[in-house]
Design a protein with these regions (language model features):
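A conserved mid-protein helix/loop that constitutes part of the nucleotide-sugar donor-binding site
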Residues: 20, 220-243, 258-264
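Donor nucleotide-sugar binding/catalytic pocket of nucleotide-sugar-dependent glycosyltransferases
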Residues: 56-59, 127, 156-211, 217
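Short alpha-helical donor nucleotide-sugar binding micro-motif in glycosyltransferases
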Residues: 171, 281-282, 289-294
Length: 401
């Protein structure tokens, strides 16, 4: 059992996104290690100390006003600077009064734009899993008209990794950096890293029962699940359907976001109302029903940092069609996914149509790929296996000093 100082500026099992991810890490690590958590208490939310009574929690209240404008706050995290100062001061004072930790682990923020408050102390430091900073492919750079203006600030990430001394020092001083996919190492190529390993930012508790779709009749059901933003490729998926008009395929789109209205307009303009159904946001239980009813999971996101939704789909024994860029390409194998290159919207739509046609026409191939998907996710994405790996990393880091 290691004495772990866990740094997570947001940690809430009743929230979504990174707050939920951090909570999963904290709860599970506390089952194996002696964890002290440094975090923020978001105004109006239940404190982490109440949600995680089995561990020591050091919690500061998020400054007023900084939590407003949810999407902007999610991207820029204006509260991170005061959290950084609080956490760094606490670490300095804790070490001065004789507290001892075997290592520090900072699993969030996932984005590679935030320096760690633990960098530079005489403690082994594990950062990650981190990811993001993927630019859009050149052929798509002028195609996004529905996203808010502030999402373009992501373009600054790579410049900061080149020029920001505090950010560079965090990764340079880390004893190990976990990246959510292989591309992260390429993005960090300009920073000398001591150790780099690939690990997804979250995992699955357990898998549902394997699903046998071999005897199904009726149209082949395609499924997309995710936030509706341009980079998810939903427009391109819709544009692919007229190219397979001779095949009995239908598409269910589960998710909400600024792309919903443009996608609904596109469906109407192409006369696809009978083949495409947009369901908006759905509860986790209902999303599970969509996975079970689907025959093929189609996720053509071309700037997807992680592969969590692909893990979910594989857990439901689904063959996948993904873009071979970022997280989904890394999370899947060639045995369970058709991986597409990406250059322009037109080429992506035609490649999607070709992949859909191949799978729609061959139930045996779908069945084999679905079985391979279930086997693959069982070997790579369960929390139990992930935490076993983390235990090994912790032991290695703690033994270095």
């Amino acid at each position: 059992m290691a004495r772990v100082l866990l740094i997570a500026p947001t940690c809430n099992g009743e929230d979504v996104g990174e707050a939920w991810v951090a909570f999963q890490w904290a709860r599970r690590l506390a089952e194996r290690h002696d964890v002290t958590l440094l975090t923020y208490h978001k105004r109006g939310a239940r404190p982490a100390a109440e949600q995680l009574p089995a561990m020591r929690v050091i919690e500061w209240c998020e400054p007023p006003l900084l939590g407003r404008a949810e999407r902007l706050n999610s991207l820029m995290k204006p509260a991170y600077l005061p959290f950084y100062l609080h956490a760094r001061r606490w670490i300095r004072q804790a070490l001065a009064r004789g507290e001892r930790f075997d290592l520090v682990h900072q699993p969030v923020p996932v984005a590679m734009r935030y320096p760690s408050p633990a960098a530079g102390f005489a403690l082994p430091l594990l950062i990650g899993p981190v990811g993001g900073s993927l630019p859009s492919p050149e052929g798509f750079t002028t195609d996004d008209t529905s996203s808010p203006w502030f999402t373009r600030l992501r373009a600054l990430d790579r410049h900061r990794l080149t020029w920001d001394p505090w950010l560079r020092a965090s990764f340079r001083n880390a004893d190990c950096v976990l990246g959510i996919a292989d591309y992260v190492k390429e993005i960090l190529a300009g920073v000398p890293l001591k150790d780099f390993q690939v690990m997804s930012e979250t995992g699955l508790d357990a898998l549902p029962e394997r699903i046998d779709r071999s005897g199904r009749q009726g149209p082949v059901r395609l499924l997309f699940v995710g936030r509706l933003v341009r980079t998810k490729g939903v427009r391109d998926l819709i544009r692919a359907l007229p190219l397979v008009s001779d095949l009995p395929v239908e598409l269910d789109i589960v998710g909400e976001g600024p792309e919903r209205a443009p996608c609904e307009a596109l469906v109407a303009s192409l006369g696809l109302e009978a083949r495409v159904r947009m369901h908006g946001w759905q509860s986790k239980e209902k999303v599970g029903a969509f996975y079970r009813a689907a025959d093929i999971f189609t996720f053509p996101s071309y700037r997807e940092p992680g592969g969590n939704v692909a893990l979910e789909a594989m857990g439901y024994s689904l063959p996948l069609i993904v873009v071979d860029r970022g997280g989904p390409g890394s999370a899947t194998s060639d045995l369970c996914a058709m991986k597409l290159s990406v250059s322009t919207p037109e080429k992506l739509a035609s490649d999607l149509a070709a992949a859909i046609a191949t799978l729609a026409a061959d139930a045996g191939l779908r069945d084999r790929m679905g079985r391979a998907a279930y086997d693959h996710v069982g070997k790579t994405a369960l929390w139990s296996a992930k935490l076993d790996r983390v235990d090994t990393i912790y032991a290695d880091l703690a033994g270095q000093r």
